[in-house]
UniProtKB/Swiss-Prot annotation:
It comes from Klebsiella pneumoniae. Keywords: Antibiotic resistance, Hydrolase, Plasmid, Signal. Residues 1-20 form the signal peptide. The gene is blaCMY-2. Described as a cephamycinase, but cephamycin substrates such as cefoxitin are chemically very similar to cephalosporins, and sometimes classified as a type of cephalosporin. One of its GO terms (biological process) is antibiotic catabolic process. Pfam families: Beta-lactamase. Coiled coil: none annotated. Its EC number is 3.5.2.6. Class C beta-lactamase which confers resistance to penicillins and cephalosporins. Has nitrocefin-, cefoxitin- and cefoperazone-hydrolyzing activities. The active site is at residue 84. It catalyses: a beta-lactam + H2O = a substituted beta-amino acid. A beta-lactam binds at residues 84, 140, 170, 172. This is Beta-lactamase CMY-2.
Length: 381
């Protein structure tokens, strides 16, 4: 009996110590500062905003300048260019269109753009565009493609290197086209559909494709070789890399994607789940719609090395997950993003109710971002 009581007491002590070990706001701040302050110095980053979602609650931290010339500090309202983290918005909006019955990932691309008459487009589905597996679409749409006619000409003349689904080659020209075609049945522009179906329902009031005049004061300058820059307009930019947002809105975005049960709109809730479904396996990584996932727990090396451009931008064999596997809570879900003057990173583990947003007004190497995020979240889990 004594043995049993002692055992129970030990178990209770262990379980209570787990709760007692919950971090205070000051402890979270210390953990974040110890990683971010030296990172900013080493990478010469003018300004950063970070949100940590710990036990489901957001904590915000800001450093440095949003505008060096005018001495404007980074605040919780500062707008940063998200770069390719914009693709996660594209994936969720596409998932919402699927949930509404407007599109199917199995649909041929030509159903939504009949003018694509080239033979190479036969057999390419929306799924392939959304997951970079169409057969080798290029990373960027060429700069001289400036209107819809030139865009059609570009896609008509593109020739695949592989059969659809053979390899994954990360490409703005792939998921960008998916986003544009996914909203066609709605009759809305991409920006309008994103605003009505994703941003407004999630109350992301400071997330923009086109930053309005009254928000320009909060729009940070990015810095490239010390010079202030903003992203240049381009074809399918909104769909691939065109979103700007604040650290508060991005924390809300992570919370919604980490646990969509509080999202009122059923199609959006389903869209969030579809974006984290697993459509292809590429090594340790699973490709979703915009989001990329790895099984949790994992070793730091697998995400840090996987984020290096030599791996992330390489053509790698893709194994189809058929039928797609539904979202897995025990996952490291993440996305990097860059423009000429900005670098962002978002990661979360739904099972742990733990996530991070890192926004910087300078582009710096992806592995450095991922390692910093890992170090912070590892200390908080």
């Amino acid at each position: 009996m004594m043995k049993k009581s002692l055992c129970c007491a030990l178990l209770l002590t262990a379980s209570f110590s787990t709760f007692a070990a919950a971090k205070t706001e000051q402890q979270i701040a210390d953990i974040v500062n110890r990683t971010i302050t030296p990172l900013m110095q080493e990478q010469a980053i003018p300004g950063m905003a970070v949100a940590v979602i710990y036990q489901g609650k957001p904590y915000y931290f800001t450093w440095g300048k949003a505008d060096i010339a005018n001495n404007h500090p980074v605040t919780q309202q500062t707008l940063f260019e998200l770069g390719s983290v914009s693709k996660t918005f594209n994936g969720v909006l596409g998932g919402d269109a699927i949930a509404r019955g407007e599109i199917k990932l199995s649909d041929p691309v030509t159903k939504y753009w009949p003018e694509l008459t080239g033979k190479q487009w036969q057999g390419i589905r929306l799924l392939h565009l959304a997951t970079y597996t169409a057969g080798g679409l290029p990373l960027q749409i060429p700069d001289d493609v400036r209107d819809k006619a030139a865009l059609l000409h570009f896609y008509q003349n593109w020739q695949p290197q592989w059969t659809p689904g053979a390899k994954r080659l990360y490409a703005n020209s792939s998921i960008g086209l998916f986003g544009a075609l996914a909203v066609k049945p709605s009759g809305m522009s991409y920006e309008e559909a994103m605003t009505r179906r994703v941003l407004q329902p999630l109350k992301l009031a400071h997330t923009w494709i086109t930053v309005p005049q009254n928000e320009q004061k909060d729009y940070a300058w990015g810095y490239r070789e010390g010079k202030p820059v903003h992203v240049s307009p381009g074809q399918l930019d909104a769909e691939a890399y065109g979103v700007k947002s604040s650290v508060i809105d991005m924390a809300r975005w992570v919370q919604a994607n980490m646990d969509a049960s509080h999202v009122q709109e059923k199609t959006l809730q389903q869209g969030i789940a579809l974006a984290q479904s697993r459509y292809w396996r590429i090594g340790d990584m699973y490709q979703g719609l915009g989001w990329e996932m790895l099984n949790w727990p994992l070793k730091a090396d697998s995400i840090i090395n996987g984020s290096d451009s030599k791996v992330a931008l390489a053509a790698l064999p893709a194994v189809e997950v058929n039928p797609p596997a539904p979202a897995v809570k025990a996952s490291w879900v993440h996305k990097t993003g860059s423009t000429g003057g900005f670098g962002s990173y978002v990661a979360f583990v739904p099972e742990k109710n733990l996530g991070i947003v890192m926004l910087a007004n300078k582009s710096y190497p992806n592995p450095v971002r991922v390692e910093a995020a890992w170090r912070i979240l590892e200390k908080l889990q």
